[in-house]
Amino acid sequence: MYKRQLFLFCGAFADFLAPYGMNDTDMLRVLEAPSLAHWMGTDHIGRDVFSRILYGAQLSVIIGFLAAGLATVISIVLGVLTGYFGGKADMLIQRFVDAWMTFPDLVLLIVVVSIVGPGVNQIVVILGCLYGIAGSRIIRGSTIAVRENMYTHAAQSMGANTLHILWFHVLPNVMPVVTVSYTHLTLPTKNEV
């Protein structure tokens, strides 16, 4: 447990903790053993290994939290809309979610990266979609429960439009589930580790 917290701390403060820049080279110190100047030694072109590990942790933390944020947005939009409106669109989207969840995440990630190309932005979008589509199922179930409550029916009978009901009645009551899902959706951070 403390390893993960240490990793997140080092990733968040890599700019302050790293003694050298990520790509600073020193050709006079190639393949140097660990010392006081270079805690984990240097690589084949004289870069400090410890600094590069810290900056790598920073990139992993950034990718993980951005992917979790995107996954949360996708799961809220899909889950609330399909859960509130229901019907054929809900059934079609849920069958797509069922099919999506049967594929292994790593295989989907490799296939999509081979199609769109490598890059940080692509990884964030792919991980966000992977976890967001699967997470929409939880939000949908909570939305269906909220939709059937009396205050939602009372708002409808008073003439409130759909957007008002979604924004002021459904979404606030789904937010506890969203919060718990977001803490669970930091799985992209764990995958990056």
PLM region descriptions:
Residues R4-F13, F65, G69, V73, ...:
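Generic alpha-helical transmembrane segments of integral inner-membrane proteins
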